[in-house]
Amino acid sequence: IQSFCFTTSINRISEAKILLKSLREHHSQPIFIHCDWFSQLVIERLGYKDLIINPVINEKYLKNIVEKHTKNKYDILEQIHHCRSDYILAKLRCLKGAMMMFENTLFLDTDVIVLDDLQENFTTKVCLSPAHFPNSIRHFGFEYGFYNAGYVFCANRGFPSFWIDRFLKD
């Protein structure tokens, strides 16, 4: 793993601080972060080295995503799963930004806590985290998918653009 990346904003800054602390306990690789200006201030005060902070997330940025790309397209996703489409696209853009700087990266959602060294010998250029469904709702995998993007290992520079294209056009 050459780098890590994640997105955060004021509503997830507590999670982001825990993610950063747990990452730095086990890893020294650069961390590419898309965030809002407030999160940038908080993160910079933590004093961690090798952070690449890109404060692009703001109301105008998010509103632009909705108006130009996702308006009404993902209403059901947002209502049922409380998963904002504007943040999903921001996450994909973060992955793309990290891949423009590094040969590979591991994207992590801010609710991930790193408990050990994550260095793995990935056998594919893209690795998605599996979604977990208890036996009683295992069939949900067919409806919602068997993978989520809580973590994404990427070593293919074209993949983020492909994923963004699929997200916007499918």
Indicate where each model-derived feature is located:
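Glycosyltransferase catalytic domains, chiefly GT-A lineage
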Residues: 1-170
